[in-house]
Amino acid sequence: MKSAHLKRLASALLALSAVTHAHASELFPNLPAKTIGVQVKIQNFTVEDAAHIKAAGFSFVRFGVWSDSLSAKAYQQQVSDAFAAARSAGLPVLLTVRALKPLPANDLATAGESFANALAGLEKSYSAQLVAIEIWNEPDLDTYWPTRNFDTTFVPFMNAVCKSLQGTAPTTPRVGYGFARPPTAGSASTVALSRIVSEYPKCLNAISYHPYGMTATQISNAQTFIQQNFHLPGVISEWGISALSSNGGNDGQASKIASFIADVKRLNIPLTSIYEWKNSDTGSNDREKNFGLLTSGGQPKPAKLAAATQLNTQ
């Protein structure tokens, strides 16, 4: 009797797993079975990097572009070159798009329409390579929302973006808004999302956030909150750990990355991007400079092997 019960339970769990994985592939058609990628910077992302990223077991790359720089020919070429590097290794792209300059607070509708046009142009150019377009990055931080006054400026702008985008059928999934912290009960991001999603329920395919410093249980709770409140899946568009001595140095970084990848695989997160492939010499402090799986010169750190081991473990 117990054996039959266990078999039924095993069958049910297998079916649930199949549904979850089917959901992931339906959500992001250009994403292969594996759903973990890594962030790169367009200014120094090379064909060689792409080959090593693919060999390590990552299934996509994430990089960002600035909508208000896209009119410059040199910048257009830099973006095109980054896509070409990714294509050389068969790596699709999670493309994060935001503006650098403050938006005109007295004309957010026009600004939203203009931003939507930039998104549509990128989608038209690169849809065959896109995992998804991520709309904005950490707007809940003033650094990345220079317009300021998030509570009063974010929703009008994003509603204008969604209104402009609804006129054409999307060929690429859209995720938003790369929050620095996941939405929680009563938070500014939850209030904003509730208004946007109720007004434009088809604007986004998933809610993205950055769970730095969060435990697996906290991430699981965030996923549940997002699904229950917005009826959309949650995805992790950025997470990393710096190789500071306070984190255990290079070995501590490696251990924490291995644990994180194991956790998101177990939690069946539909998409996760690790920050980042190489150290950033341009970081503003030691913490910001040492998130890479490789040194800035391209030498592997222990974190690269730790990530590859987890990524290639079924």
Please give the residue ranges for each predicted region:
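Structural motif corresponding to the early beta-alpha repeats
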Residues: 61-67, 79-109, 135-136
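Bacterial N-terminal signal peptides that target proteins for export
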Residues: 2-10
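Sec/Tat signal peptide C-region and signal peptidase I cleavage site
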Residues: 20-24
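Substrate-binding cleft of secreted/luminal carbohydrate-active enzymes
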Residues: 245, 249-314
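Bacterial N-terminal signal peptides
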Residues: 10-18
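Hydrophobic faces of well-ordered beta-strands that scaffold small-molecule active sites
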Residues: 34-40, 61-63, 93-97, 131-135, ...
